[in-house]
């Protein structure tokens, strides 16, 4: 921990504290400051001018990151009949209703669950297990659908879900430190464009209040929010 503390401080010295950088500069700086021995995730933290206590100011949605997430997503599809083959052909890792019992028994070796609407009655019984882990299928996220082929392809191809927390912040990954700068820039733009479009009509005043970017272990860099106003 002491060594990591020194590395963190050394990395922090490469940025100008209190300065807001253009996105391109900030991304380059985050890549430069990354010091962990593993391929760190590059994460965005956005503070929004909303009050999530009011239902009409909750910001949530999905976006397909053009350059992907850098993570191999394990996709589970709960479906029957022809939808089983459709999901398998689309590349799902696990398919079938038998996995519901496995989940009840403690199995959770997947990252995304997709379900056809007719299966949600059974899946709802697993809410206490799936909900806190962010694994519950949701129509708004496109994971409750009869078009399982599209849902699987999107999940495998870089689709992420975001939701504002109680403090008015959105946290989301945009790739890995090993990504090329232009890949991270493209993913960042896709995320920001989606969040800007998701501004609630009830939100008043400045919407995008602060944006910071960091690697998993590295210090944060503030991004200039002027382009998003």
UniProtKB/Swiss-Prot annotation:
CDD domains assigned to the protein according to its UniProt record, in alphabetical order: Ribosomal_L1
PROSITE patterns: RIBOSOMAL_L1
Species name: Gemmatimonas aurantiaca (strain DSM 14586 / JCM 11422 / NBRC 100505 / T-27)
Molecular functions per Gene Ontology: rRNA binding; structural constituent of ribosome; tRNA binding
Domain of life, per lineage: Bacteria
Keyword Ribonucleoprotein recorded: yes
Cellular component terms per the entry's GO annotation: large ribosomal subunit
InterPro entries: Ribosom_uL1_bac-type (IPR005878), Ribosomal_uL1 (IPR002143), Ribosomal_uL1-like (IPR023674), Ribosomal_uL1/biogenesis (IPR028364), Ribosomal_uL1_3-a/b-sand (IPR016095), Ribosomal_uL1_CS (IPR023673)
Function recorded in the entry: Binds directly to 23S rRNA. The L1 stalk is quite mobile in the ribosome, and is involved in E site tRNA release. Protein L1 is also a translational repressor protein, it controls the translation of the L11 operon by binding to its mRNA.
Pfam family, one: Ribosomal_L1
GO BP annotation list: regulation of translation; translation
Protein name: Large ribosomal subunit protein uL1
Quaternary structure, from the entry: Part of the 50S ribosomal subunit.
Family membership noted in the UniProt record: Belongs to the universal ribosomal protein uL1 family.
Record key words, sorted: Repressor, Ribonucleoprotein, Ribosomal protein, RNA-binding, rRNA-binding, Translation regulation, tRNA-binding
């Amino acid at each position: 921990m002491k060594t990591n503390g020194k590395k963190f401080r050394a990395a922090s010295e490469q940025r100008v504290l209190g300065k807001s950088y253009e996105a391109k500069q900030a991304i380059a700086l985050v890549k430069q400051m990354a010091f962990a021995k593993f391929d760190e995730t590059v994460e965005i933290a956005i503070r929004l001018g909303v009050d999530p206590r009011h239902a009409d100011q909750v910001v949530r949605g999905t976006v397909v990151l053009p350059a992907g997430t850098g993570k191999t997503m394990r996709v589970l599809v709960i479906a029957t009949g022809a939808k089983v083959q459709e999901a398998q052909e689309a590349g799902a890792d696990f398919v079938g209703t038998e996995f519901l019992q496995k989940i009840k028994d403690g199995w959770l070796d997947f990252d995304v669950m997709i379900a056809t609407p007719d299966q949600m009655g059974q899946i709802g019984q697993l809410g206490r297990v799936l909900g806190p882990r962010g694994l519950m299928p949701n129509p708004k996220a496109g994971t409750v659908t009869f078009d399982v082929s599209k849902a699987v392809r999107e999940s495998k191809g870089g689709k992420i879900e975001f939701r504002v927390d109680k403090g008015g912040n959105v946290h989301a990954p945009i790739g890995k430190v090993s990504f090329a700068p232009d890949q991270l820039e493209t993913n960042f733009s896709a995320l920001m464009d989606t969040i800007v479009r998701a501004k609630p009509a009830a939100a008043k005043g400045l919407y995008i209040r602060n944006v910071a970017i960091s690697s998993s272990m590295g210090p944060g860099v503030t991004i200039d929010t002027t382009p998003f106003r």
